[in-house]
Amino acid sequence: MVMAFPNKEQLEDSLRGLVNEFGLLIEGIKITKAGAKSAIRIAVDTADPRAERPDLDQLEELSREVSKHLDDAEAAGEMSFGAGYTLELTTPGVDFPLVEQRHWVRNIGRLVRLAGGVERIAQVEGEDVVLITPDKKQPSVRRVRFADVAGAVVEVEFSQAPAAEADLVGLAIDAYGLPGAEDQQDSPAED
């Protein structure tokens, strides 16, 4: 029986244990099928959002192990990659959407683009995120469920955060004097 090129779920199921052995999680898999030019792109990251991202040496070592694992699976008839493929292991880039709590924690202090504009992540606790709405005179803060703003993307910033915003980053959640996110409306802070 000829097996088809594996899909994302099959690859993730096959690779999860190996990637976890390196202390990493699979954040995403992208498959591009194009005959001999097919590509598999796997984004991995640390499970601990406060830990350093994997460096190039770790990615290179993991890439060798993943390649060997996939070659062995193909030789055993468990998967078929056809005419060949290119394997790319990477970490999530700045365009990677913030979906999980750990994504938000990793980016505390950074600007994010939301449906309603750009805000800064001040703090994350449980299911809530405190966002700073930039304002030259007096930035405002709001507390929302991060699930309500899932899909935000980090905004590249070329300068330091204004002092008024930087002072609000990383405070204990109750220091903001905000009600719980479930008590607030879903509308963004007023300008």
Curated annotation (Swiss-Prot):
<dbReference type="InterPro" id="IPR003728">
    <property type="entry name" value="Ribosome_maturation_RimP"/>
</dbReference>
<dbReference type="Pfam" id="PF02576">
    <property type="entry name" value="RimP_N"/>
</dbReference>
<keyword id="KW-0963">Cytoplasm</keyword>
<dbReference type="InterPro" id="IPR035956">
    <property type="entry name" value="RimP_N_sf"/>
</dbReference>
<protein>
    <recommendedName>
        <fullName>Ribosome maturation factor RimP</fullName>
    </recommendedName>
</protein>
<dbReference type="GO" id="GO:0000028">
    <property type="term" value="P:ribosomal small subunit assembly"/>
</dbReference>
<comment type="similarity">
    <text>Belongs to the RimP family.</text>
</comment>
<keyword id="KW-0690">Ribosome biogenesis</keyword>
<comment type="function">
    <text>Required for maturation of 30S ribosomal subunits.</text>
</comment>
<dbReference type="GO" id="GO:0005829">
    <property type="term" value="C:cytosol"/>
</dbReference>
<dbReference type="InterPro" id="IPR028989">
    <property type="entry name" value="RimP_N"/>
</dbReference>
<dbReference type="GO" id="GO:0006412">
    <property type="term" value="P:translation"/>
</dbReference>
